[in-house]
Amino acid sequence: MRKFSLRDMKKVTLGKALFAFISSENMGLKKKSQRKEMKIHFTNLFGQSSKSVALMAQNDIMNVVRELGVNELGIYFYDHSNEPASELNSRMDGILAGVAFGDIVFVQSPSWNGIEWDRRLVDKLKLLQTKLVMFIHDVPPLMFESNYYLMPNYIDMYNQSDLVVVPSEQMYHRLVSEGLTVKKYVVQKLWDLTHSLDLYTPQFEKKLIFSGNPSRFPHIIDWKYETPLHVYTEPVEGVDYSKVHIEGWRTKQELLLELSKGGFGLVWGNSENPEDERDYYKENISYKLSTYLSAGLPVVVPDYLSNADYIREKGLGFVASSLEEANRLVQDCTEEEYAQMVRKAQYTSYLIRNGYFTKKLFVDTIMALGE
């Protein structure tokens, strides 16, 4: 049997070392050649009532972008007033577990867990060096006068983003006047309300329809116009509904089917007199409006609504300066005029039902982030 010499042993050792070196170099080349794929994430709200418009709006957005390959970051609405800092930190780490350095994150704002909670989440996202998009649904300091003192905190949070998605041009300029410094922005214009229901074709009826709780709209309960008003809401004990037709509460699917039968969907602010209306309703966009349009229903809106020009330009209904004028416009409408509005509303209904306003703002945002 041949014996191995010291020279043979050195050859074997050198060969192993060379093989190990070549292998490690190849692995390094593979790692360098494999670029990490950037992911896009959206926060999404859970834990509120199924009747909550805030929850429905965020969930509707998520349903659309999920089809585009977006990852969901679920945020639960809860009372965190007594939550220890360490537990909150762990909770947020869990929410953001799938987010990597350099990813794009859309924060649907607010989470309704309070500004401090939201700011802490944003701080964590900034540590991950994400491209941060603040998708502003509502601005609590502008919604409620009692919360206006929180405005600097919200502006501070918004200013950490790379781009803001705002409901309207009016809202962007209002936020700039409050101290917003983010230059890149995308306008949402309308909410999407996706569904695949086989709806009716709206028929001409001289009636107005109001969907939602009228408790914040005393002029709805105290209706005093010729055109009958049908209100879809859960009746509250002790409230006099004798001046309106109460239709009860409906699920989303039931409501859309009922709306598509005909009439005009009414969108109005908290005040009967437009001069008394707070600016917020003029800067935000109405989920109620998209509900009507999703059903293919012509609408009646106030002239101060942020997207009133869209309704006027597309011929989707009437734009009125008062409820008295709204009543007159409906009463003077002809069957031919109504049929023309329905035809035009069908196109916008298609866009809303299939999520095109969300898809457009999504693409516009991604493109703008790369500029």
Describe each region flagged by the PLM:
Residues R2-D79:
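N-terminal subdomain of nucleotide-sugar transferases
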Residues K314-A320:
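A short acidic/histidine/glycine-rich donor-binding loop in glycosyltransferase catalytic cores
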Residues N82-H173:
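Extended catalytic core of nucleotide-activated donor transferases of GT-like folds
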Residues Q253, L257-A295, V301-D309:
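Nucleotide-sugar-dependent
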Residues S321-R328, E335-E371:
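A charged, aromatic-enriched C-terminal amphipathic alpha-helix characteristic of glycosyltransferases
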Residues D162-V176, T181-L197:
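Donor nucleotide-sugar binding/catalytic pocket of nucleotide-sugar-dependent glycosyltransferases
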Residues W191-S260:
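Conserved catalytic-core segment of nucleotide-activated headgroup transferases in glycan assembly
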